[in-house]
Amino acid sequence: MIAFLSGHLVAIEWGERSSLTVEVQGIGYRVKAPGRFLKQLPAVGEPVRVFTHLVVRETELVLYGFGSPAERDLFVELIKVSGVGPALGLALLNTFGLPELVQAVVTENVRLLSLTPGVGHKTAQRLALELKTKLAHWRQGMGVADQPLAGGPPMPIREEVEMALLALGYSTQEIQAALQALPTHPRPTEDWLRDAITYLSQQP
């Protein structure tokens, strides 16, 4: 198994291909990755390290890449779930940051999980059912459990605010960024929602 690649970034492909090419000792490796990770990459030509998971298919070998061992390991757990292949695994990690995704699974937030492109209600339920206990233990071992989200309301207020903002047309990425940017002092759901809308309206 190829645990990681350490070399120079050659290219980034966006959209459906969503991948990067890394040159390691004269060999170029094409690695599929979530768009969220691609946005964090340095400029082409700069050194880069990508943590990888190899998926063996009948006709090809496919490398999937991530920004940390924890993201890679979470991807591996996701694709073990029946009906969740690598494409949906990437979609989940592109829609949510690692702490948000783990929290959504552990708290069985099916409505939030099903907002991921390609993830229906039944698949979201299956994710929560099969991974809830496993991820609760896994995140403790990875040190994720004791790392609260940077900003944002506590559950279940967070879920109410997220659903209200989604109904207003904001994307999941925009909502997560807004909630993490807000101060954490206690306040009613309505105030959290108003503050989030104010923040989002000020963004370019």
From Swiss-Prot:
Localization annotation: Cytoplasm
CDD domains the UniProt entry points to: UBA_RuvA_C (cd14332)
Region (Flexible linker): 147-157
Cross-referenced Pfam families: HHH_5, RuvA_C, RuvA_N
Name assigned to this protein: Holliday junction branch migration complex subunit RuvA
Purpose of the protein: The RuvA-RuvB-RuvC complex processes Holliday junction (HJ) DNA during genetic recombination and DNA repair, while the RuvA-RuvB complex plays an important role in the rescue of blocked DNA replication forks via replication fork reversal (RFR). RuvA specifically binds to HJ cruciform DNA, conferring on it an open structure. The RuvB hexamer acts as an ATP-dependent pump, pulling dsDNA into and through the RuvAB complex. HJ branch migration allows RuvC to scan DNA until it finds its consensus sequence, where it cleaves and resolves the cruciform DNA.
SUPFAM superfamilies: DNA helicase RuvA subunit, C-terminal domain (SSF46929), Nucleic acid-binding proteins (SSF50249), RuvA domain 2-like (SSF47781)
Keywords: Cytoplasm, DNA damage, DNA recombination, DNA repair, DNA-binding
Record-linked InterPro entries: DNA_helicase_Holl-junc_RuvA_I (IPR013849), NA-bd_OB-fold (IPR012340), RuvA (IPR000085), RuvA_2-like (IPR010994), RuvA_C (IPR011114), RuvA_C_sf (IPR036267)
Stretches the record annotates as Domain I: 1-67
Domain of life: Bacteria
A GO molecular-function annotation: ATP binding
Region (Domain III): 157-204
Keyword ATP-binding in annotation: no
GO terms under biological process: DNA recombination; DNA repair
UniProt family annotation: Belongs to the RuvA family.
GO cellular component terms, semicolon-separated: cytoplasm; Holliday junction helicase complex; Holliday junction resolvase complex
The record's note on its domains: Has three domains with a flexible linker between the domains II and III and assumes an 'L' shape. Domain III is highly mobile and contacts RuvB.
HAMAP family: DNA_HJ_migration_RuvA
Subunit structure: Homotetramer. Forms an RuvA(8)-RuvB(12)-Holliday junction (HJ) complex. HJ DNA is sandwiched between 2 RuvA tetramers; dsDNA enters through RuvA and exits via RuvB. An RuvB hexamer assembles on each DNA strand where it exits the tetramer. Each RuvB hexamer is contacted by two RuvA subunits (via domain III) on 2 adjacent RuvB subunits; this complex drives branch migration. In the full resolvosome a probable DNA-RuvA(4)-RuvB(12)-RuvC(2) complex forms which resolves the HJ.
Region feature (Domain II): 68-146
